[in-house]
């Protein structure tokens, strides 16, 4: 973990991501992360469903030109139904925002989540109770 950036998200939001991933399983899910960056922390405060997203077996796609011009978007989250929480080259090539969060099957705990920067370096995740 060469980057000292920490990503924080509430347990409630993380549970919402897990629930969405479980409902679409075995298809991938994709959401936008809204929040704020301050010093060494990105705090995720909301989830946004992207317009015209397509959820498929082994992929999730959306027209990036349709994303809202909203500077409060700090990144994206998507699921890997295989359980592998490492980013693929496609994931990194379609990086949007400051962070990429990946949730993997069985979508049950913080052990099924990883967060990365645009270089593919893993970031620290803090799950809060707020």
Listing of model-derived features with the role each one plays in the protein:
Residues 76:
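Conserved, mostly hydrophobic/aromatic
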Residues 1-73, 81-130:
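Conserved beta-strand-loop surface patch within small alpha/beta domains used
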């Amino acid at each position: 973990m060469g980057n000292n950036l920490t990503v924080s998200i509430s347990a409630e939001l993380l549970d919402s991501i897990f629930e969405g991933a479980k409902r679409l399983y075995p298809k991938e899910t994709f959401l936008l992360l809204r929040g704020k960056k301050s010093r060494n922390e990105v705090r995720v405060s909301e989830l946004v469903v992207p317009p015209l997203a397509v959820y498929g077996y082994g992929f999730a796609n959306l027209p990036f030109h349709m994303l809202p011009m909203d500077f409060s978007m700090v990144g994206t989250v998507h699921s890997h139904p295989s359980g592998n929480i490492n980013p693929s080259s496609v994931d990194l090539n379609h990086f949007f925002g400051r962070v990429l969060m990946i949730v993997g099957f069985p979508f049950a705990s913080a052990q099924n989540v990883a967060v990365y920067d645009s270089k593919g370096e893993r970031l620290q995740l803090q799950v809060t109770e707020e």
